[in-house]
Structure formats: C-alpha cells, structure tokens
A protein has these predicted regions:
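DUTPase catalytic domain/fold
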Residues: 1-139
C-alpha cells in the first residue's frame, strides 16, 4: 500500500504485537514475501513520523531480488526512557524499490581496487581522485 499516488515507498505493516524497550531493537514480521521486478532490489526505510514522534528507527535492510522469504523489519527504539508498543496493523516502515547495476570488480597493480562500469570505464579513470576519502573533496 502506498500513502499517495506520488509516494516513493510501499508501507509495511506489523502482523503481531511487540514491545520495543528503550534502547533495544526487535525484528518485526510483516507477513509478506515479494517478487521484485528485474534489475531492482528492495530497500527498507523508516517512516518519518515514527522517527520524529516516537524515536523509532529502522535499521538498514536490503531485499535482494532472489530472496523468497518473509520481509522482516528491524526496529530500534532510540528513546532511552519510554518503551514503544507495536500493534498488529501498524505501519512500521516503507519499502522502496531501487535499480541496481552489477559491476565487475577488477584488481589493479596499485593498492586501489576499482569497479568497471557497463561501458568498460574504470571508476579510477572516471574519478581521477586518488586514495583520499571522507571529506577530501571539501564541503
């Protein structure tokens, strides 16, 4: 279910009741399994209202296209004082479908290990950035 016709994500619902204690996390069942369109994977993301109003966050979740099991969501209660109660039918997260590209990993003669795009360009040729990272290109 999408919240509106322009919503990027599909709402995921809890099938059971859970109590998420302060600072703890739980794995929540959704009761669904999905078949993804070719060339896509599923990304499980938080719902902004749960995060802002209740301090409930979704930990990273990736659904690979060949996964056939139940979609489950890892929720963490960031509120250190109050438990959060989840009831059946609560919208707990959203599923966003994203396209992906499989790149060939190629080892180079230097310490850099790069990726080759579908065009055959290496990431090193495209970036020419070197080994600097984490803020090396500025703000």
């Amino acid at each position: 279910v999408r919240g509106s016709s322009d919503a990027a994500g599909y709402d995921l619902f809890s099938t059971d009741s859970y109590v998420v204690l302060p600072g703890r996390r739980v794995v929540v069942s959704t009761g669904i399994s999905i078949q993804l369109p070719p060339g896509t994977y599923g990304s499980i993301r938080p719902r902004s209202g749960l995060a802002v109003k209740h301090g409930l966050d979704v930990l990273a979740g990736v659904i690979d296209p060949d996964y056939q099991g139940e979609v489950k969501v890892v929720l963490q209660n960031l509120d250190m004082n109050q438990p959060f109660v989840i009831r059946p039918g609560y919208r707990i997260a959203q599923l966003i479908l994203e396209n992906y590209t499989v790149a060939e990993v190629v080892e180079t003669p230097t310490e850099f290990t790069g990726l080759v795009t579908e065009r055959g360009d290496s990431a090193a040729e495209a970036a020419r950035r070197g080994a600097a990272g984490f803020g090396s290109t500025g703000l």
